[in-house]
Amino acid sequence: MFSNIVNKKLFQNSTTTSFLRHYSTIKNTTTSPKGFKTGTYACGLKKSGALDICLIHSEKECNVAAVFTENKVKAAPVLLSKSLIEKHKNTGFQSLIINSGGANACTGPEGEKNAQTMSFLSSKLVNAKQQSLVMSTGIIGQQLDMKKVELGITKASENLKDDWLSAAKAIMTTDKVPKLVQKQIEIQGKQVNITGICKGAGMIHPNMATMLCTLCTDADISEEALKSALKHSIDYSFNSINVDGDMSTNDTVAVFSNGLAGNKRIDSTNSKEYLLLEKAMRECATELAQMIVRDAEGATKFISVVVRGAKTEKDGKIIANSIATSSLVKTAMYGEDANWGRVLAAVGYSGADGVVPSNISMWFASGYGDNIGIGQKNDPLIAMQFLKDGQPTPKDDEKAAKLLSNKDISIIVDLNNGNQNYTMWTCDLTVDYVKANSHYRT
């Protein structure tokens, strides 16, 4: 365990090491999955005139797995895409059409018709056998200008190429930067590529938020194995982030696999090949999820909430979520105030069963990570302990404020009641967040 002030290694993967990282240098690479192309267009849905239509097409039919918002109020494209995947049993898809600048949510029969139009038109233009899946993002309750949308889809279909960066830009709303990851692995001697794009900066909460994400891979994997890989990928990525506790009507994560990498089809979820692909998908999803938190509306700090020693993983997740969604904790981090009492209160009211107050220890730390004591060289974690076995420890307010002035900080809570750990990523709550959301429609 930590002493009052210690240096420890902090687990860190190759994702994010500074606030908003090197977003300005994100670019297309040569590791795009075989057989996929993207087309984009600015049809005028956004007042800024920025790209707002994205069409993704595979030359070969794909297996698809997807997860959707758990909000009871679901947007028309969510309902349509979900029904198409169920109807076709996750197979035979070649295209996805996305618009930003309008959520097409709470738009009634007209909105449902517009989602169908987007689906049929885009699939027809790329000669796909099945309807396209559809995603939309933007303001809720406004009908899409379908003349603009149909023009945009047509233009995008005429300009299909290997340009994932433009695709990432086309789905942005309040995002400050595009979010794109590309990864290459080897399976059975074959080069397998994965590309992911996503958008999201507000209305972010576990079990999906105002977030759209598409992963495309040329791996050959069965639909059942693909569904399993996606589930495990999002459980510890998109379902482990929080910005403001609001859950959107449009959240969707979908993965397409066309098999053009040439590997032997992956059927078993116990195989070495499956585990390699799942790990790569999870790493892509984690990086994209953390990009969302770092790009959160008004955010100035990336916060890792690390719960250790939980009796069950469920308890760990419940407590991490309670801390990550606490407005008082988030504003304290913005103010660089080591108010550990707010964290302890969030633990207490979380509803988790395995909470024994006299067992709890707590640290605040500079740095980013999820497993204290495991990390890369030259990556020290500076931690200060504020609670030991349920009792406060002596603290130096000046040193604490300096520690919390870092852009990457960790809140570490050890329940000392088991061996399960859980990490959630969140951000601070700032004046700029209030400004951004009070003026969103204007």
From Swiss-Prot:
Pathway(s): Amino-acid biosynthesis; L-arginine biosynthesis; L-ornithine and N-acetyl-L-glutamate from L-glutamate and N(2)-acetyl-L-ornithine (cyclic): step 1/1; Amino-acid biosynthesis; L-arginine biosynthesis; N(2)-acetyl-L-ornithine from L-glutamate: step 1/4
Transit peptide boundaries: 1-23
Active site: T210
Keywords: Acyltransferase, Amino-acid biosynthesis, Arginine biosynthesis, Autocatalytic cleavage, Mitochondrion, Multifunctional enzyme, Transferase, Transit peptide
Record-marked site positions (Cleavage): A209, T210
Domain of life: Eukaryota
Subcellular location(s) per record: Mitochondrion matrix
GO BP term, pick one: L-arginine biosynthetic process
Reactions catalysed according to its record: N(2)-acetyl-L-ornithine + L-glutamate = N-acetyl-L-glutamate + L-ornithine; L-glutamate + acetyl-CoA = N-acetyl-L-glutamate + CoA + H(+)
InterPro entries for the chain: Arg_biosynth_ArgJ (IPR002813), ArgJ-like_dom_sf (IPR016117), ArgJ_beta_C (IPR042195)
Molecular function terms from GO: glutamate N-acetyltransferase activity; L-glutamate N-acetyltransferase activity
Matches recorded under Pfam families: ArgJ (PF01960)
Binding-site residues for substrate, renumbered to this chain: T173, K199, T210, E297, N437, T442
Post-translational modification: The alpha and beta chains are autoproteolytically processed from a single precursor protein within the mitochondrion.
Broad EC category: transferase
Site, as annotated: Involved in the stabilization of negative charge on the oxyanion by the formation of the oxyanion hole: T137, G138
Family: Belongs to the ArgJ family.
Job description of the protein: Catalyzes two activities which are involved in the cyclic version of arginine biosynthesis: the synthesis of acetylglutamate from glutamate and acetyl-CoA, and of ornithine by transacetylation between acetylornithine and glutamate.
Name of the molecule in the record: Arginine biosynthesis bifunctional protein ArgJ, mitochondrial
Gene name of this polypeptide: argJ
